[in-house]
């Protein structure tokens, strides 16, 4: 995520001014303050890695990402390469369920797979996403975990593959929410903070 992309999405959708709608999806705990404290802009790009470096912040964030879905019957957590692997696996352990990987591009991924090409993201890029067909079944209720959601195009592609496998969509839980109210409702997005709450890029760091 870049500072330019953040400004572009804010200007196009206006969704980040819809405080009353946005607040309904926000979780409150120590994780929110820790995420805001450790977030940085580096070269105009969002850097959430410092959150992961701090064990207390990481534990708080993982707990908050899992929190709204503890009693939701989730049977598997899904994560998109690459930060989704880190966060998704941690949330899966927190919930006591297994992890399902979604890979990008042409990396080695054995077995029969489903493939989706996402709609363009905030940079205009379309990602090819792949899911092992055997990883999700009709009895599964799948939660997607990621660090940031902007257009929701990749999350929507993952939902399509999960449902093609016969699985059920539990929702999407992220650290930073930058999507529109309509897409937020469609995907069942829960977040720790919104993009509007992040410190502004100073144009130098």
Write out the residue ranges for each language-model feature:
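Short, ordered loop/turn segments at secondary-structure junctions
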Residues: 82, 104-107, 175-178
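Short Gly/Thr/Asp-enriched flexible loops that form oxyanion-binding sites at enzyme active sites
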Residues: 86-95, 158-159
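Acidic, divalent-metal-coordinating active-site segment for phosphoryl/phosphodiester hydrolysis
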Residues: 146-156
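PRPP-dependent phosphoribosyltransferase catalytic core
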Residues: 2, 6, 15-19, 23-31, ...
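Active-site-facing substrate-recognition patch
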Residues: 15-74
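Short glycine-rich phosphate-binding loop at a beta-alpha junction
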Residues: 74-81
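Short, glycine/charge-rich flexible loops or terminal/linker lids adjacent to PRPP-binding catalytic cores
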Residues: 97-142
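Gly/Ser/Thr-rich loops at beta-strand to alpha-helix junctions
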Residues: 81-86, 151
